[in-house]
Swiss-Prot record:
The lineage of its organism: Archaea, Thermoproteota, Thermoprotei, Sulfolobales, Sulfolobaceae. The gene is leuB. This is 3-isopropylmalate dehydrogenase. Its main location: cytoplasm. Homotetramer. The keyword Hydrolase does not apply. GO terms for cellular component: cytoplasm. Binds 1 Mg(2+) or Mn(2+) ion per subunit.
Amino acid sequence: MTFRVAVIPGDGIGPELYEGSKRIIAKLIEKYNLDIDLIEVEAGDVALNKYGEALPRHTLDVIEKADMILKGPVGETAMDVVVKLRQMYDMYANIRPAKSLPNVQSKYPNVDLVIVRENTEDLYKGFEFVTSTGVTIAIKVTTEFASKRIVNVALNYALMRRRKVTCVHKANVMRVTDGLFASVCREILKGKVNFEEMYVDAAAANLVRDPTRFDVIVTSNVYGDILSDEASQIAGSLGLAPSANIGDRKSMFEPVHGAAFDIAGKGIANPTAFLLSVSMMLSRMYELSKENKYILASKSLENAIIETYKSGNKLTEDVGGSAKLKDMVDEIYKYM
């Protein structure tokens, strides 16, 4: 099968990240004979100014026919783009790896964990009300269906990794909603992996104390949103973190960092998070096709990034180097 990928270059540094990464993606396609068709589309602040919509109809038409979305950072319209696409295509699993890179200053040089976050429910469902002057209410939604779905995703990740899952919740206080999530975790995970439960406040503390104790963390939407940013920063920098939004019908891959308008056009942006998102996309292609060439390409790209950091010769300013975006891309290309 040929994977059709809708590419949203985005705003700020987004277009130059994609432009700089094109030769690496082309090299992977050529070297591993990958069946990938990349289609550039417009979305974000630029699209809003041009068409009056952050996600114009012609963009949605292309995305509808695509298998995956590769997205650069967008600016003020991020919610209009990211949240809308997540909802439209039921991208229920947010996957956030947090992994240390060589020569990146961090208290912990050996962090390697994945946070699997439920992406459709919880307080982020958006059910908020003003009941009277000075009084507001939000509804926290937890269903057995969504809980089982995300816990099974976490199980699959754990079986490919170190076979440990930490279920993070606050069932001692949220006894009904988090209680349901915790019971689903026990039902699915006990006996299949090294399983533990942890209250979210303890998890936040333990990530700071010793992040190496974690392998796969599975949790609900709000807790996952907070913990994943914490974990990325502990591993080195939020600016180096990739992410995936996985759905059965369509998935989206994007760097966690923002559009960084202050450095846009200067050629000094770090391509790491964008390229690691490409690696995650290739891994998803392997999951769907079962063709080894996609996972080989994914690992090749990740290893080239790691080797670039090991050498330390061509790193951008944000990670202590003096290289330009093009220099770092050339170095990654060399290690491929």
